[in-house]
Structures are given as structure tokens and as C-alpha cells.
Amino acid sequence: MVFKRFLVAALLAVLLLSSASLPVHADQPSSTPDNTTPVSFTDISEHWAKDAIERWASMGVIVGEEGKFRPDDPLTRAEMAVILQRIMRYQTTSTDYFMDLEEEWYVDAIQKLRAAGVMVGDENNRAMPSESITREAAVVLIARAFGIYPTQQELHYEDTESISSWAVGYVSALSQAGYVRGGDNNCFFPAAPLTRAEAVTIFNNMITACISESGDYDYRPFEGLADFVIIGADNVNILNFDIGGNILLTEGVDAETIRLKTVKHYGEIWQYTYDGFKQHLKVYSYIVPVNENLPVCSYDPSLFVKDENGIMTYDDPRYTTYFGVDVSSWQGDVDWHKLKEQGVYFAFIRLGYRGYETGVINLDTKFEDNIQGALDAGIKVGVYFFSQALDADEAYEEAQFVLDNIKGYDISFPVVFDWETVSSDTARTNNIETEDLCQAANTFCNTIADAGYIPMVYCNQNVSMVYYELSRIQAFDFWYAEYKDQPTFYYNFDIWQYSDSAKLDGVPNANIDVNISFVDYSRINP
């Protein structure tokens, strides 16, 4: 994992420049609602890093002594460990102690950084807590803490040969990504010490928001794109924030309790765990962990092409795609021969639905007209049932209803379980549990498969990743709904419903849903 260029480009460059030329912009993060208690020091009133120091001191991340901060003193390795621990909030403590540690204030932080693989010590198993941290060592610790891995890209600093072997890969990674650059005479100065003010400024510039307590955080006064946002507590609601960089959840935070309300996010979401960094996704206002056992979407979004008639194709000779529609009684009377003339290859016909309040199962009033009309026009046909099942028993009832009503029809495309949320306070499915929904989908699809048809699950990003546990339904093909020119779904899908507002001849009185399929199901023998 390598974080975005705009997160730390020119920020870690602080490491490579003298304090007189540091690119300080600490006033930007200071406008965010951190968990703070005002703190100041007597020796920073005229210092270039005053705002950054006061901000991070007020959050309790840095401290001084006897009212002084000593901003231009070198930062020790112990102090760097404590700062990183207060930001990252590691929970696991290594029982493998460095040989040079005694009972001091920094031991807990160092041992937690050791457990996280951030601080590994030297070849003699020493942490050297009282020594000044060098620029190359600071790069290594920061990179490890934030998940930036070493690379072998060739370096072009004048003093490259002076960089230690254990640091050169990290320096290479940060340089390759544009995160660091040379100072005077294009030198890296790997052995030069890092001052306390320089260290604070690095974190101040990297991290726009550092949340350590539960609560609501409204960033409405903040302008521009935020950089790094770190969330170190459960039950956090973030509002009115444009985040250009990454969101990082610290160890142990329950992602299900975080809400990103009225938040635009352009970066990635990661959580540190003892097993390493795990990726998460923003789904509406939710944060959802990535399931590493599911196949990632294999399609290139840029290759989806829509023509002047709204027909979507996929511009890759390795794939053959098929254009289709889905209809219900909402479309009224449909001229299926006109749809066939416009290139419609397949159609999903709504067979029926369960009332979202009453729970009563109904046959779609246009089902028989639509399915017979599509078949007469030579269009391949599948059916879907709009489910509001609460459990497996109701899903079985729905599947049997479908099977009873498709007898005698040539069903060559899938039979679809279409469970959706309903925007109503009285919807019977409002409080459904994931376990019940997954059991319902499996029961419906297995019943359909047992009858000799191809089962499929339909849903959008919200239902698929917030309501379902996708690994529980991955045995079935997936029909994904997202009304955009390019899909953004993280996982693979078989059919994409890309619009619910298409205009096609043959459907004069309503919009129609249109789809692109990567599978010709009529050629599959289930």
C-alpha cells in the first residue's frame, strides 16, 4: 500500500530541509475540530512552528517540560515512538523486549511499535531510545507506521551511498512516489538529526484531522481538500468534509460504528490490524471492510462505452457483451418487436413482488403480457421477483411462487432474487439482520437451482455491502445496479444495470432500465 501523492508530497520533504526553509502551513489543520485542551509553551512565541506545536500539544500528542518545548532540540527515538503511539494507538504489546530498555516512560510505546513492526531496533537488539533520531530513521518509522512499503527504485541523490541498507528501500519508495526530495546540492543527509519542531510539522502537515474520542465532528468551516484523516475511536460521525487523502482507522476501532455523513472522499480507507493494514470501502455513509476472499472487479471502467442511443458496450475484444432491459407493470404497454429492432438481446421480466408493508405476494399485472411478448419477439428471457422476505421461510415461499408461474415458458436467462430496501418508516424489512437476509437469498436461489434454472442475486452497492455478507452469496451470479457511465463496484459482477432512465422506442410512456451482460445465459445448461 502506497498512499496518494498529495497526502505527503512535500510534507516529508520537511525531513530534508533546514528549519529555516520548512514549508509550514500549520494554520490549515488548526481549523478542524480536534479533541483539544489549549496548551502553550514559553519558548515558542516567535518560533516558525508555533501553530503546529500548540495544536499537537493541545491534543496531548506532544508535551514539554517546565513550560518549555525546546523546539530546536533533536528529537530522540523514544520521543518519536511516543508520538507515533499517541497517533496510531497501537494496542498489542510485544513481549520480546529490546535489550537496552529500562522502566521508563517510553517503554510501552516502543514495545507497541515493535509489535506493529514499526520499530525493529539494530542488529544488537537495541532500541537506542535516548539517541537522536536521524532523518533516514524517521523516514523508516513514518513509512512503516503509515503503510508505505520499501521499493528498489534507483535513487539519484548525491549522497545515496550514505543511506543505510535498512533505510534505502523506504527512501526509495518515498522518493519514487514524490514524497521526499533532496536538500542542498541534491543531498538526502541521512544521518542528520531531526528536531522536535520539524517532527511536529511533518505530522501537522500530513494529518488534517486526528480524532481520538467518540462524537460528531462537523468540518463545515474547513475549506479545500483534507489530507490524512485518522480515526482512533468508535462511534464517530464526520460531517461536511471533503477528504482528498486517505482515512486511517487505528487498531481496534469498530468500523461499523463510523459514519461519513455529507463527506466526499477521494482517497482510500485503511485500518491497521495486528496482521497488517486492511482495506475498507466507503459505501454511502458506511465504512465496510474489503473481503479479500472475493474476486475483485476485473473490468476496466474506462472501456465501457455508451453510444448515442444509450446502448452500453465493453470495448475489449476478449469479451462479448449483450444489451438487455428489465421491465415491470410500471412500463405499461411494451412493443417488444421495437425493442428487438434496437438491439435488445435479453429481458428480465418482473414476475411478482411481496408488499413491503403487508407482506402479501402479488403477481405483476403485466407479467404474462411481457414475458410472452418478449419471447414472441425472439428476446431471451429471465425473470425477477421483488422480495421483501424476512427470513428463509418467506424466501422459499417466494421461490415456489416464481416456479409455479414460469411453468411453460422458455426461461433462458436467470431467475433473480431482487431484495431491496424501501424508503418507508413502516417497511417490514427495516430491521432485518444480515444473517436472515443471507439465509433468505440462499434459500431462494437454491430452490431455483434445484428446479433446473439459473439463480442470480440483484442488488446495488448499499444492499450488497451493508446488508449482505457477500461471501455468503458468492455462489450465485450477481446483477449489479449503479446508474453511472462507469461502474465503481469493488467486486466482480456478471450483469450491470447502468441506467434506470433510458428512453427506447417501444416504451412510450415510461423510462426503462437497461443492462449490459457479460454472459449469454441462453448458452448455459444449468
Where do the model's predicted regions map?
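Functionally critical loop-and-helix segments that line ligand-binding/catalytic clefts
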Residues: 273-324, 471-526
